[in-house]
Amino acid sequence: MSREATKLWKERNPRRIWAHTACKSARHRAKKKGVPFEITTDYVESILPDECPIFNTPLKYYGNKVAGELSPSLDRIDPAKGYVKDNIVVISNKANTIKSAYKSRDIFIVAQWLKGIEDGGQS
C-alpha cells in the first residue's frame, strides 16, 4: 500500500486504529503489571460503543490520537484480573480518569452533596 493509500485507510478506519493502539498499549501495561492479557484488536473493535456507557456522551475516535475527555479509554473493571474479555469495557477518558482517581465511596459522597445543593440544600 502506498503512503497515500495508507493515510486514506487510517482516516477511514479510526475505530480500527484506536482498537489496535489500545491493544498494543494494554499488552505493554499487562506485562509491566504482571496481569493477564487475552484480548485482540478484533475483540476490542467489536465492543467499541458510540457513546460512553457512563455519561451517555458520544465518544470521539481519532485513530491513535487522544481527543480529550471524549476520547475512548480501555478500562479494566477489576484491575487485578487484567485484560481479559469479561473484564474490559470501553468508556470515555473522562469517566476512566474519575474512576481511577477516586474510590466509589468518595464519588458517592460528592454526588450526594451536589444533589443536596441542586435540591436547594446548604453547602
Report residues per predicted region.
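Short linker/helix segments within small regulatory modules
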Residues: 67-87
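Residues immediately within or flanking Cys/His clusters that coordinate Zn2+
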Residues: 48-51, 71, 89
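Repeat-unit-sized solenoid/scaffold elements
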Residues: 74, 91, 120-122
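Contiguous alpha-helical segments
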Residues: 1-61, 66, 84, 94-98, ...
